[in-house]
Amino acid sequence: MDEVVYIPPQTKEEIECCMINLENFININTSDFCDLDPLIKLAIIHHQFESIHPFYDGNGRTGRILCVLYLVTNDLIDLPILYLSRYITHNKSKYYDLIQCIRDNEGNNEKDWQNWILFMLKGLEQTSKETVLLIQNIKIPWMSTRLKFGKNLEQSIAMNF
């Protein structure tokens, strides 16, 4: 039998209070709040959402999409194309261990937060590089095909869609 390592807020009132607190934190203008870098704030937001665990299912997916939406909303990326899912999946046990370390110390250990934030920053960096490479691998053949077929390709695409 698996050991329960964390019990998230249980009652509707607890969850609602935590979500309101998180929503307020997300919407506070960072420059008004303190000198908190938006990427560090993103790591804190993600941890807090995962700890609130407001849904029966889908918290992980929702937490990851929340990261992407935060990046877009804060003009850190133009389009919602940066997904941390692969990074988190490949580093799943470290991801959960780091989240749990913060919970175990009730968020009071600065080193736990530092390790978590560095993990998330590394994930953002790695995912960004992979995304740029993927776009380049799509763009180069597309441009080559476009040059080869020119307007005929554009007309064919327009007629088929």
Language-model features, listed with the residues they occupy:
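FIC/Doc superfamily catalytic core
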Residues: 1-161
